[in-house]
C-alpha cells in the first residue's frame, strides 16, 4: 500500500538519500509488475525431508532468491564467481541470500477482493466514495445481495440492493441483459471504476453550500474530504479492490525446523496458505462451470481468507491457529507494543551493553562508576584487540581473542589504559526522565556488581535492594564526545522539571551533616562552662584534633584543656572569622572547611532542605566545577560524621505523650455528644460520620504535635535519634512518628472511605487483633493501587511524549508581542507559590518598574529574569508580571528560546535544538509514577484535608469583598453566596469603602485572602481590626446550608409528599425527616417566605435541590439567618494522587468531567423561570443591554447562586468541575490556558511535587494547535474540518492575496491522544495508536511526510532534527546545498560557453 515506485527508489531509501516519504494505494499493475518477482501458485512451503523450498511455493528460490549465498537450488552454480547468472536448470539467480528479505511475490486472485482496511475502518472509505452505508456494502461484499451497477432501461436505480428473490423477479420482468447487477468485490470494483470523482466533488460542494443543517453539513464535509483526497492524489478508487495480493519476502515470515521434525512458522504463512488454497480451488470451480451457489460460497470464503490475512478478527470470528490462538495478521504485525513500529523501529536492542546488580560506591568521585573487570573486558574487547595489534603483542584478531580469554597480564594493562577517559552510559529502568541515563568514567573493580555514587541515586530513583542497571559503551568518537560533554553525571545535578538540585545528600549523609551542625550546647558554670574564645578556625580545628571529639557528652581522647575537659563538638565557642567574632560550634567550623569561601560562614543547623538551598546557591556563585567538588566533600563528610556519631534508635527513644489518655477521653466524649445529636435528629447520619472524623483528625494532629514537641525538648534532644532523623529530613516524618508514639489514627477502607473508629494504639504499645486487622485492610489498598497505577502513569507519560515530541527550540526569538500574566498563588493567607518562583527564568514582555517610581526599571522588556531580578520584583510588592510563554510563541515550527526562557537543568538560556517537548512530557509524567508508587508508604492512613475554621495569621483590617450575608439571631454574619472572599489588609488608616475600592481594582495587595463557602459563619465585622491568631470565621464542612435572609412565614411550594418529597424515618434515631427526592414531574420544589401569615405578600423564594433535608415546617415563623434546609455533603474521602492521576489525565485528555458544573455565558443578574422537562430554567440577564442567556439545569444539581446574584462570564452556577471546552467557548483561549495550567499544577502541588509552569504550558499549547472551520470562504478548507493554526493562516493569506474571501474558524481543544493522531506526520501518528486507521487515511489522500519531527526520523533511520548540534548541522546542510547549486550553475555556464 505504498506509492508506486521503481527499484531505484528502494536503492535510494537504503542509502537514506531522501527527505520525504509519500504513501499511496498500490495499483494491480504496480503490485504485479514493479513489486513482484513472480507469482505464487502453490500453497507448499518447504520439503519436510530435504528442508529445501518447494518450487512455485511460498518459499520458492526461483522467485525469492537462493537460501545460501552464491548457490543455486540444484547446486550447479556455487561460489561468487558465478554472480548474477540465472541457472538454466532451476531458474535461480546466483546472488546473496539476503535478497530473500527484500524480494516480494504476488498471488493472482480469481476474482477481485475488497481490501478490508478501506471498507471496515471507520469512516468506510469505499462507503464514502460510493455514498453507500457500511451495512449495505457488507451485504454486497459477502455475497448476500446484488447491487445494480447499470440499471439500463429498467426502473431500477444505480447502487440499489437486490436480494435473490428480487433479482430473479427483475430478471423475469426485464430479461438478464437489460441491466447489470453483481455481487462481491467485482461489483464494488465496477462501481468504483464508474464513479466520476470530479463531478461528485462538485455536487458535494454544491450540497454543502445549500444545506443549513449542522449535522448534514458535518456528514457532507467528511465525505467531501475523502473524495477530495482521491481527486487531489494520483490514487484511483478502484485500487481499493485487489486483483493481486502482494506476498511478503520469505525471510520476514520464516519457517524454522525444530528438533523432532516439527517446524516453527510465522502465522503469515498459514494465512497465505489459506488464501492460495481457496484461490486455487475457486479457479478450478470456475473452470468446471459449477452451480452459482457453490461458486458464490467459495468467493465469499476467499474474501474472508484475504480479510484474515490483512486484519484477522476485523470481520467475523478470527482465524485460529494451534492452541486456539488467533493468528497474527499483517495488521497485528504493525500494531501495538510488539508491532513493527514500536518493537523494531522505535525501540531496538543495543550491542556493546551489559547489565548487573548495583551496589553503593561511597569511595567514588561524582563522575565515576565502578565497572566489574570481567564486564569491562567483554565490553571493551574491540578496543583491546586494536591496542594489542598496534602494540605488536598479537597479529591476528583470533590470537588477540585467545589472549583475552586467557586473561594475560598485558590485557589488563591495556584495559586500564583504554578506559581512561572513555565514558560509559549507565541506565536504570524505568527511564522516566532524561536523568535515567547518565555517563560516568569507569573505574575497574573486583566482583560482579556495578558500583554507583550515592548522590546519583535520586536521579535514577535507585536503591540497593537488588536494583539492576545497564551499561552501554559509546563506540564512535562523536558518541564519546557527546557522552563526555552533555551526559556526564556532574552536568546533571539539577532537575529539568523544576531546577531544584537532584544530587543532594540524603539518609546517612544528611544525618551526619545535621549532627555536625547541631545548635550550640551551653555548659553550666559549675562544669567549667565558660565560652572558649579562639583566634581563628585553625586554632579550633587544632583544639578539636588535640582534645578529641566529644560525642554524647563523653570524652573520646586523652588530652584535656585547663578546665580538665576536651572540646565538645557541639559546645558553644567564640571564634574570629574574617575580622568578626562569631558564636558558633567546633562542628560548624569543621563543616565550613569544605564550604567554598564565596558562600560565607554557614552558622546554622543543616536539615536536608537547607543543604539543597546551599547547593543551589553554590552553583549560582561559584559554578559547576566547585559545586561538584563541594557535593563530593559533603558526601564524604556526611558518611564519616554519621559513622562517628553512631546514631541508632532504641525503643525508649519513642516517647508516648503523657496527655494522650486525657486527649482520648475528651475525644470520646465529643464523639458521644455528636452521636446524641444524631439520635435526637438534630443532624443526619452523614453529618455524624463527618463530624466524628473531624474530631479524630483534630486529635491525631494534637497528639502528633505533642509528641514531636516532647522529643524536641528532651534534655538530650540533640541526641534523640528519632528527632534527629526526622528533623534532619534523613528518614521518616511526623506522620510516622505519630504512629510510633502517639496513635495510628484513622484508617481508610480500600474504596477510600474512612473508617470512623480510629486505631488509638501506637506501635510502641502494640495493636489489638481488631486494630491490626483494620490496619492491614487499609495498607493492602496501597499495594494494590501501586501495581495498577504504575501502568496508568506510564501510559500517560507515553501520550504526553507523543503529543509534545515535535516541540523543539527552532529559533532565538520569534519577536511576538503577546504575553501571559502571572501572579503569586495563594490559598487563604498561605502563599503556595511566590511570584519570584513563577517568573524566574522567564522573559518579561514589558518593562517592570519599581511601584511609584518609573525611573527605576527592575527589568527591561526582553530580559530573561535571573533569580536576583525575580527576587527584586517580588520584594518590590509587584502583584503580577507580564511574561512571554510558549503558549503565545509565534514560531512557524517548534518554539523560540525567548518564549521558553531558561533551561532549568543548567540555569542558562535554552539552546537551539533542545527537545523541550519531551522534557516537558517527562517532567509531568515522571512524578506521576513516583506518586503512584508512594501511596502505600503511609499504610492506608486517612489523610483528610479540610479545616473547620479560618484563623488570622497576622494583624490587619478584615474587609468583606463580593460577600452577601445575613446577621443571625446570635449576631454572627452568615454568608449567602459562594463567590465572595475575606481580605486581610494592612492597617493604613483608610476608610472601609476606600479599602473595598482599592481591592476591587487590585490597587492594593491583601496580606491574606480567604475564599469563604456558602453558610460560613463570620465572627468579625466588616472593617474590624483583627490580631494574629484570632478566629475570623467558622466553615460548615458537613452540609451545604440553605439560609433564609428575610423574616416571614414559611410556605411549601411543589413540596408534594410522595411525589417531590418523602418522609423517611431514621432507623437509628426514630425521627421522621422530610427529604426532597428526585422526581419526573413538572414540580419545582421551593420554600416561599411571605411577610404575613395569610400568605399575601411574597418576600422571597428558595429552590430546594433533591437530597436536601427540610429543617422548617409549613407556616412556621422564621427570622433572618435561620436554616431552611440542608444538603449533606458526601462523606469525606481521602485525598490521594489516586484521585490526582486520573484528574491529570482527564485534564490533558480534555474529557468532560462527570457531573460537570454549569457556567454563566454572559455577565449579568441571576433569575429563575420555572421548570421545563425536569430541568430548572435559570436566566442570566444583562441589565445594560437587556440580553438574556438561558441555562437548563438538572434538578439534582446544587445551585451556588441565588435570584438577584450578580455573576460574571465563566462563573460557576452549580457545584462540580468545569468543562474545559465551555471555558474556551465562553471565556476564550487565554482563560482556558490559565485554567488548565492551574488545575494540573494543583494536583501536583497537593502532593508536594514541584513542576515549572513552562512544561505544562507546552502540553497545553499542543492541545490548542488546531482550529475548526466554521466558514470555508473561498479557501480550499472544508466546513467542520480541524486544521493546524499555521495552515489556516497560510491558506487565508494565499486566498486574500488572490482577492478571495478568507475562511472563518474557532479555536478547538483536543485531548492529547487526539492531538497526537492529528499530527502532520502520518508515520508519527501510525506509530502511536490506531495504526491501521492512520495508514488507511494517509494512503487514500496520498499524504507526504516531510520527516520534520523526531519519531519519523528515528523510524527512517535518519539523524533527528534536534540536539545541541542541530543548528550547526542545519547550517552545514544549507551551505552544502548552496555549493551544489553553484556548482551546477558554473557547469551550465561553462557548457554554454564551450557549446557557443
Curated annotation (Swiss-Prot):
Q: What's a Pfam family in this record? A: RNA_pol_Rpb1_1
Q: Which GO terms describe its biological process?
A: DNA-templated transcription
> Which residues are involved in binding Zn(2+) 1?
72, 74, 87, 90
EC top class named in words:
transferase
GO cellular component entries: DNA-directed RNA polymerase complex
| Catalysed reactions, as listed in the record | RNA(n) + a ribonucleoside 5'-triphosphate = RNA(n+1) + diphosphate
Q: Which residues cross the membrane?
A: none
Q: Which domain of life is it from?
A: Bacteria
Describe how the cofactor binds: Binds 1 Mg(2+) ion per subunit. Binds 2 Zn(2+) ions per subunit.
Is the keyword Transmembrane helix in the record?
no
The record's section on CDD domains has: RNAP_beta'_C (cd02655), RNAP_beta'_N (cd01609)
- One Gene Ontology term of the molecular function aspect: magnesium ion binding
Residues binding Zn(2+) 2, per UniProt:
814, 889, 896, 899
Listed cofactors: Mg(2+); Zn(2+)
Q: Give the keywords, sorted.
A: DNA-directed RNA polymerase, Magnesium, Metal-binding, Nucleotidyltransferase, Transcription, Transferase, Zinc
Report the EC number(s), separated by commas if there are several: 2.7.7.6
Q: Which NCBIfam families match?
A: rpoC_TIGR
> What's this chain's function?
DNA-dependent RNA polymerase catalyzes the transcription of DNA into RNA using the four ribonucleoside triphosphates as substrates.
What quaternary structure, including any partners, is listed in this protein's UniProt entry? The RNAP catalytic core consists of 2 alpha, 1 beta, 1 beta' and 1 omega subunit. When a sigma factor is associated with the core the holoenzyme is formed, which can initiate transcription.
Q: Which HAMAP family match?
A: RNApol_bact_RpoC
Q: Which family does it belong to?
A: Belongs to the RNA polymerase beta' chain family.
Name of the protein this chain belongs to: DNA-directed RNA polymerase subunit beta'
Please tell me the species this chain comes from: Chlamydia muridarum (strain MoPn / Nigg)
Amino acid at each position: 500500500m505504498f506509492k508506486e515506485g521503481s527499484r531505484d527508489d528502494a536503492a535510494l531509501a537504503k542509502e537514506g538519500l531522501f527527505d520525504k516519504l509519500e504513501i499511496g494505494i498500490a495499483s494491480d499493475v504496480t503490485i504485479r509488475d514493479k513489486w513482484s518477482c513472480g507469482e505464487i501458485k502453490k500453497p507448499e512451503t518447504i520439503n519436510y525431508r530435504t528442508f529445501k523450498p518447494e518450487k512455485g511455493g511460498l518459499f520458492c528460490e526461483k522467485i525469492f532468491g537462493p537460501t545460501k549465498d552464491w548457490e543455486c537450488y540444484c547446486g550447479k552454480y556455487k561460489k561468487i564467481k558465478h554472480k548474477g547468472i540465472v541457472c538454466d536448470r532451476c531458474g535461480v539467480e546466483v546472488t546473496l541470500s539476503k535478497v530473500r528479505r527484500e524480494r516480494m511475490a504476488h498471488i493472482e486472485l480469481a476474482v477481485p477482493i475488497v481490501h478490508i482496511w478501506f471498507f471496515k475502518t471507520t469512516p468506510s472509505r469505499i462507503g464514502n466514495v460510493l455514498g453507500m452505508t457500511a451495512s449495505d456494502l457488507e451485504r454486497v461484499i459477502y455475497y448476500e445481495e446484488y447491487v445494480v451497477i447499470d440499471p439500463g432501461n429498467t426502473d431500477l436505480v444505480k447502487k440499489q440492493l437486490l436480494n435473490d428473490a428480487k433479482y430473479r423477479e427483475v430478471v423475469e420482468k426485464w430479461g438478464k441483459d437489460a441491466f447489470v447487477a453483481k455481487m462481491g468485490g467485482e461489483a464494488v470494483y465496477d462501481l468504483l471504476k464508474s464513479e466520476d470523482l470530479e463531478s461528485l466533488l462538485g455536487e458535494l460542494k454544491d450540497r454543502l453550500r445549500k444545506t443549513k443543517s449542522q449535522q448534514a453539513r458535518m456528514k457532507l464535509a467528511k465525505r467531501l474530504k475523502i473524495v477530495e483526497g482521491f481527486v487531489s492524489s494520483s490514487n484511483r478508487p478502484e485500487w481499493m479492490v485487489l486483483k493481486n495480493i502482494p506476498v511478503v519476502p520469505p525471510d520476514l515470515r520464516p519457517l524454522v525446523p525444530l528438533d523432532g521434525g516439527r517446524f516453527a512458522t510465522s502465522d503469515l504463512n498459514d494465512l497465505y496458505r489459506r488464501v492460495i488454497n481457496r484461490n486455487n480451488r475457486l479457479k478450478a470451480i470456475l473452470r468446471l462451470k459449477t452451480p452459482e451457489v457453490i461458486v458464490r460460497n467459495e468467493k465469499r470464503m476467499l474474501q474472508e481468507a484475504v480479510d484474515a490475512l490483512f486484519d484477522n478478527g476485523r470481520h467475523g470470528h478470527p482465524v485460529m491457529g494451534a492452541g486456539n490462538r488467533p493468528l497474527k495478521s499483517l495488521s497485528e504485525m504493525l500494531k501495538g507494543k510488539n508491532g513493527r513500529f514500536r518493537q523494531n523501529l522505535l525501540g531496538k536492542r543495543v550491542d556493546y551493553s551489559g547489565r548487573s546488580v548495583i551496589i553503593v560506591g561511597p569511595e567514588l568521585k561524582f563522575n565515576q562508576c565502578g565497572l566489574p573487570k570481567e564486564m569491562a573486558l567483554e565490553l571493551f574487547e574491540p578496543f583491546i584487540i586494536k591496542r594489542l595489534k598496534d602494540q605488536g603483542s598479537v597479529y591476528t584478531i583470533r590470537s588477540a581473542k585467545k589472549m583475552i580469554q586467557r586473561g594475560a597480564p598485558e590485557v589488563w594493562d591495556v584495559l586500564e589504559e583504554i578506559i581512561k577517559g572513555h565514558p560509559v552510559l549507565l541506565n536504570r529502568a524505568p527511564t522516566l526522565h532524561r536523568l535515567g541515563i547518565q555517563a560516568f568514567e569507569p573505574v575497574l573493580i573486583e566482583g560482579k556488581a556495578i558500583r554507583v555514587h550515592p548522590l546519583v541515586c535520586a536521579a535514577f530513583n535507585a536503591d540497593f535492594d537488588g536494583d539492576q542497571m545497564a551499561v552501554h559503551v559509546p563506540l564512535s568518537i562523536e558518541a564519546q564526545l557527546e557522552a563526555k560533554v552533555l551526559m556526564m553525571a556532574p552536568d546533571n545535578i539539577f532537575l529539568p522539571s523544576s531546577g531544584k538540585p537532584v544530587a543532594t545528600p540524603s539518609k546517612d549523609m544528611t544525618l551526619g551533616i545535621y549532627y555536625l551542625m547541631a545548635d550550640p550546647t551551653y555548659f553550666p558554670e559549675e562544669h567549667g562552662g565558660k565560652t572558649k574564645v579562639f583566634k581563628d578556625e585553625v586554632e579550633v580545628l587544632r583544639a578539636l584534633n588535640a582534645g578529641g571529639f566529644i560525642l554524647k557528652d563523653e570524652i573520646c581522647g586523652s588530652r584535656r584543656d585547663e578546665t580538665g575537659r576536651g572540646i565538645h563538638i557541639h559546645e558553644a565557642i567564640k571564634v574570629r572569622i574574617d575580622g568578626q567574632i562569631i558564636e558558633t560550634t567546633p562542628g560548624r567550623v569543621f563543616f565550613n572547611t569544605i564550604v567554598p569561601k564565596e558562600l560565607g560562614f554557614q552558622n546554622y543547623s543543616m536539615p536536608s532542605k537547607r543543604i539543597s538551598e546551599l547547593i543551589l546557591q553554590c552553583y549560582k556563585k561559584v559554578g559547576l566545577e566547585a559545586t561538584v567538588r563541594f557535593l563530593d566533600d559533603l558526601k564524604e563528610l556526611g558518611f564519616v560524621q554519621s559513622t562517628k556519631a553512631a546514631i541508632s534508635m532504641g525503643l525508649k527513644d519513642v516517647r508516648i505523650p503523657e496527655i494522650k489518655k486525657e486527649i482520648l477521653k475528651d475525644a470520646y466524649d465529643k464523639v458521644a455528644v455528636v452521636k446524641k445529636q444524631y439520635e435526637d435528629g438534630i443532624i443526619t447520619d452523614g453529618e455524624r460520620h463527618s463530624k466524628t472524623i473531624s474530631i479524630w483528625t483534630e486529635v491525631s494532629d494534637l497528639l502528633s504535635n505533642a509528641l514531636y514537641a516532647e522529643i524536641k525538648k528532651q534534655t538530650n534532644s540533640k541526641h534523640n535519634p528519632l528527632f534527629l532523623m526526622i528533623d534532619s529530613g534523613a528518614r521518616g516524618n511526623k506522620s510516622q512518628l505519630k504512629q510510633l508514639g502517639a496513635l495510628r489514627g484513622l484508617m481508610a477502607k480500600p474504596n477510600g472511605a474512612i473508617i470512623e473508629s480510629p486505631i488509638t494504639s501506637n506501635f510502641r504499645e502494640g495493636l489489638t487483633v481488631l486494630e491490626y486487622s483494620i490496619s492491614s485492610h487499609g495498607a493492602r489498598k496501597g499495594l494494590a493501587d501501586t501495581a495498577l497505577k504504575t501502568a496508568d502513569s506510564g501510559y500517560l507519560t507515553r501520550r504526553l511524549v507523543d503529543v509534545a515530541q515535535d516541540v523543539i527550540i527552532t529559533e532565538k526569538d520569534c519577536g511576538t508581542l503577546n504575553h501571559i500574566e502571572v501572579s503569586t498563588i495563594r490559598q487563604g493567607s498561605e502563599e503556595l507559590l511566590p511570584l519570584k518562583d513563577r517568573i524566574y527564568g522567564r522573559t518579561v514582555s514589558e518593562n517592570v518598574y519599581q511601584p511609584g517610581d518609573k525611573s527605576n526599571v527592575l527589568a527591561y522588556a526582553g530580559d530573561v529574569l535571573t533569580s536576583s531580578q525575580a527576587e527584586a520584583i517580588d520584594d518590590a510588592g509587584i502583584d503580577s508580571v507580564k511574561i512571554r510563554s510558549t503558549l503565545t510563541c509565534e514560531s512557524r515550527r517548534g518554539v523560540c528560546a525567548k518564549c521558553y526562557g531558561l533551561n532549568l537543568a543548567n540555569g542558562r538560556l535554552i539552546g537551539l535544538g533542545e527537545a523541550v517537548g519531551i522534557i516537558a512530557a517527562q517532567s509531568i509524567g515522571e512524578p506521576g509514577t513516583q506518586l503512584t508508587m508512594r501511596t502505600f508508604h503511609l499504610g492506608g492512613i486517612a489523610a483528610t484535608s479540610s479545616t473547620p475554621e479560618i484563623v488570622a495569621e497576622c494583624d490587619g483590617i478584615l474587609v468583606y469583598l463580593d460577600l452577601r450575608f445575613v446577621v443571625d439571631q446570635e449576631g454572627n454574619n452568615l454568608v449567602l453566596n459562594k463567590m465572595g472572599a475575606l481580605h486581610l489588609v494592612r492597617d493604613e488608616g483608610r476608610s472601609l469603602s476606600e479599602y473595598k475600592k482599592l481591592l476591587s481594582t487590585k490597587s492594593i495587595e491583601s496580606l491574606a485572602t480567604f475564599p469563604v463557602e456558602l453558610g460560613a459563619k463570620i465572627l468579625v465585622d466588616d472593617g474590624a481590626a483583627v490580631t494574629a491568631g484570632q478566629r475570623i470565621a467558622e466553615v460548615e464542612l458537613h452540609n451545604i446550608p440553605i439560609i433564609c435572609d428575610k423574616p416571614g412565614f414559611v410556605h411549601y411550594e411543589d413540596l408534594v409528599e410522595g411525589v417531590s418529597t418523602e418522609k423517611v424515618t431514621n432507623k437509628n434515631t426514630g425521627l421522621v425527616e422530610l427529604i426532597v427526592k428526585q422526581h419526573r414531574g413538572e414540580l419545582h420544589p421551593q420554600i416561599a417566605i411571605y411577610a404575613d401569615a395569610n400568605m399575601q405578600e411574597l418576600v422571597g423564594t428558595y429552590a430546594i435541590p433533591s437530597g436536601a433535608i427540610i429543617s422548617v415546617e409549613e407556616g412556621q415563623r422564621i427570622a433572618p439567618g435561620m436554616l431552611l434546609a440542608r444538603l449533606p455533603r458526601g462523606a469525606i474521602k481521602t485525598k490521594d494522587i489516586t484521585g490526582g492521576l486520573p484528574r491529570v489525565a482527564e485534564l490533558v485528555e480534555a474529557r468532560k468531567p462527570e457531573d460537570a458544573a454549569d457556567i454563566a455565558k454572559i455577565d449579568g443578574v441571576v433569575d429563575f423561570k420555572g421548570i421545563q422537562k425536569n430541568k430548572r430554567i435559570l436566566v442570566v440577564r444583562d441589565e445594560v443591554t437587556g440580553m438574556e442567556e438561558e441555562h437548563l439545569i438538572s434538578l439534582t444539581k446544587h445551585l451556588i447562586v441565588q435570584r438577584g446574584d450578580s455573576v460574571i462570564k465563566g462563573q460557576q452556577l452549580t457545584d462540580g468541575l468545569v468543562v474545559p471546552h465551555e471555558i474556551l467557548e465562553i471565556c476564550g483561549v487565554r482563560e482556558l490556558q490559565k485554567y488548565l495550567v492551574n488545575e494540573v499544577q494543583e494536583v501536583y502541588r497537593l502532593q508536594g511535587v514541584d513542576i515549572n509552569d513552562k512544561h505544562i504550558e507546552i502540553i497545553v499549547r499542543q492541545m490548542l494547535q488546531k482550529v475548526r472551520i466554521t466558514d470555508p470562504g473561498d479557501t480550499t478548507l472544508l466546513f467542520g474540518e480541524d486544521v493546524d493554526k499555521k495552515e489556516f493562516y497560510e491558506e487565508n493569506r494565499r486566498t486574500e492575496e488572490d482577492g478571495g474571501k478568507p475562511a472563518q474558524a474557532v479555536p478547538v481543544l483536543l485531548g492529547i491522544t487526539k492531538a497526537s493522531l492529528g499530527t502532520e506526520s502520518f508515520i508519527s501518528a501510525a506509530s502511536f495508536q490506531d495504526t491501521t486507521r492512520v495508514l488507511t487515511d494517509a494512503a487514500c489522500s496520498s499524504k507526504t511526510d516531510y520527516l520534520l519531527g523526531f519519531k519519523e526520523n528515528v523510524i527512517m533511520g535518519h539523524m533527528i532534527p534536534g540536539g545541541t548540534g542541530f543548528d550547526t548541522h542545519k547550517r552545514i546542510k544549507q551551505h552544502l546545498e548552496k555549493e551544489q547549486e553553484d556548482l551546477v550553475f558554473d557547469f551550465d555556464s561553462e557548457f554554454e560557453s564551450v557549446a557557443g
